[in-house]
């Protein structure tokens, strides 16, 4: 009986891990010291990656501001050095933030990001999850890269249609800047996407059955709903603002939906089984 119980536990853990992911945001190497170093960020991100290796999720997504100073090679190298410590069994998806591609992206800043980190928007599939990584600064400030912004939006429509045709159960969007912090019709500000673009994207996401958007940028936790779409804004792995604390979000995906909770570094569970 004991052997059966152990096998059952292992099978449950495997199933859980296949539908579990960690969201980390804003490691932002260099923020604590205004680009004079990144020792604090190194400690935090090392701990975050070690935690991921212990918890063994299916994947980790880092929702932007990988570095603090656009184009800073030493900051980028440190992010990649630590990220490379993630177990090969756990997939890693990096998302561009405004500090990675500049507040107003240019063809040059996009090219620099792509050369260093890879595509700035793309899709992926893990089990019953179809993930869509977006470059939110193409939504926020496309004035210098209008063609790229239009290209991403057209691409997203096509990818969402493919996922729906394939009957993927969970379609989830990951980007850096949240569409909104609390209300879908809130006023434009630094921490959200301009209303005209926001509402257009939200309409598209509703059309294809997207129920979750995970973002960062705010360096604190926030969230709201637009009907059955949940906007989840996650606090930082790196430096928090105001009442925020460094940590990460754990998401559990099942037939009944997506459950998630933000954990400060001091309150992380020992295993995923604790939060089933």
Segments from the language model and where they lie:
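Positively charged n-region of N-terminal signal peptides that target proteins for export
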Residues: 1-5
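Active-site glycine-centered loops adjacent to acidic/histidine catalytic or metal-binding residues
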Residues: 26, 64-65, 97-98, 176, ...
